[in-house]
Amino acid sequence: MGWGAVVYEGGVVGASLVGLGWAGLWFLNRRLYKEYEERRALVQILFGLVFAFSCNLFQLVLFEILPVLSKHARFLNWHLDLFCLILLLVFVLPYYHCYLLLRNSGVRRERALLVAALFLLVFLYGFWRMGIHFPMPSPEKGFFTMPQLVSRIGVIGVSVMAVLSGFGAVNLPYSYLSLFIREIDEMDIKTLERQLMQSMETCIAKKKKIVLSKMEMERIQGSEEKLKARSFLKRIVGTVVRSVQEDQTEQDIKSLDAEVQALEELSKQLFLEIYELRQAKIAAAFSRTWRGHAQNLLGYALSVYCVYKMLKSLQSVVFKEAGSVDPVTMTITIFLRHFDIGIDVTLLSQYISLIFIGMLVVISVRGFLANVMKFFFAVSRVGSGSTTNVVLFLSEIMGMYFISSILLIRKSLANEYRVIITDVLGGDIQFDFYHRWFDAIFVASAFLSLLLISAQYTSRQTDKHPID
């Protein structure tokens, strides 16, 4: 292979990674971040890298099928991508996430670096011990090998993927169908906005009181010099009075600080609730447009697929079946059985199934992310810190999710492509285990999500009016 081909293939690989990384940053800043959230440069870079390497895995699958680039270039791209992605997931992200949590908690930089290094060692030990409880490749070649690391990441990733898919299978009809959309009264939003303004004004007033109390303490402490010029009895009386005043002022400041923190937390929750109500009002108006009606029809179609997937996964878990033909392949096969137009059923259904499943994956991840954001904002008192934690957590999930997707998609590919992916990931990996593991967790996640969303819908139904 000449230098021209090397430069061309290297340019294609580099340009695709740069493009995917830019797309990841655009998605993070335009879709996930909100206007009021602080953004850290290094966190965005890590997210962009994980996004690029993760999406490149799917791109490499397409490169194998089309094919694009030479066989040697694709092989090197596979190994480079997996090496960089595993390095980020197993070493860089856990270390930096722990370091950032410590720094946000006020720990000094040197101590945070040391504690994060100790945490990484504990994480690696737990990561290794996890393999004892699941089917893993032979450990003869060591722990830090591609099959060992991919297998352990696959267990976590398939679990996360099954939870997301189970949640998405239930949340998708709830989010897309106008049947579950409720009209938001503008007066409810105005009431919350008045409460927010009152909370912020009260918070500002109490902060002013804190400043005045601190100035009073400084005045009392400054009067100590004047007491020295007085008689002994007056100095004793003045010292006692000053001590009582300082104690009372300190108690007032502590009480005001606690009230300010509570008011800031209340203001943050009110702000998020107002934002969510505004979004729900926009969604209700959108559902009345022609695009909203089209989305409603799409929601019914995807809901049928979700119900089918839940039933087939339940059947697989109960009867321990290896899996059956997906509905897309079944529909195309029945159609072409009566109308033979010379199309390869397996290849066509493979592409359509991946597109259909991909839509469910994207929607479920976005829905799950929204709930993760709510959780972190509810339990954290530092808004920017919680946002950073969510992005790093999402980066970890995303990388494991995409590696696990390759483990599961491999079974849907033709034998010639399946062999290539098997060689790249490691021939000792127990691929069938991941399909059984996915079905079991998917069923549990779907039924649990059904219970939670039903409870949420029931609790809110009395406060909102259905759309005509």
Curated annotation (Swiss-Prot):
Residue numbers with lipid attached (N-myristoyl glycine): 2
Membrane topology for this entry? Multi-pass membrane protein
> Subunit arrangement?
Interacts with GPA1/RGA1.
Name one cellular component (GO) term.
endoplasmic reticulum membrane
Q: What is the protein name given in its UniProt record?
A: GPCR-type G protein COLD1
Additional remarks: This polymorphism is associated with divergence in chilling tolerance of rice cultivars. COLD1 confers adaptation of japonica rice to chilling and originated from the Chinese wild populations of Oryza rufipogon.
Query: What superkingdom heads the lineage?
Result: Eukaryota
BP-aspect Gene Ontology terms = cellular response to cold; response to abscisic acid
Pfam families per the UniProt record, alphabetical: ABA_GPCR, GPHR_N
Q: Which residues form a coiled coil?
A: 243-279
Localization, per the record, is: Cell membrane; Endoplasmic reticulum membrane
Family per record: Belongs to the Golgi pH regulator (TC 1.A.38) family.
Q: Which UniProt keywords apply?
A: Cell membrane, Coiled coil, Endoplasmic reticulum, Lipoprotein, Membrane, Myristate, Stress response, Transmembrane, Transmembrane helix
Q: Identify the gene encoding this protein.
A: COLD1
GO MF annotation terms: abscisic acid binding; GTPase binding
Species in which this protein is naturally found: Oryza sativa subsp. indica
Q: Which InterPro entries match?
A: ABA_GPCR_dom (IPR025969), Golgi_pH-regulator_cons_dom (IPR022535), GPHR/GTG (IPR015672)
**Main location (coarse class):** membrane
Transmembrane annotation, as ranges: 7-27, 45-65, 82-102, 112-132, 153-173, 297-319, 345-365, 389-409, 437-457
Functional note:
Involved in chilling tolerance.
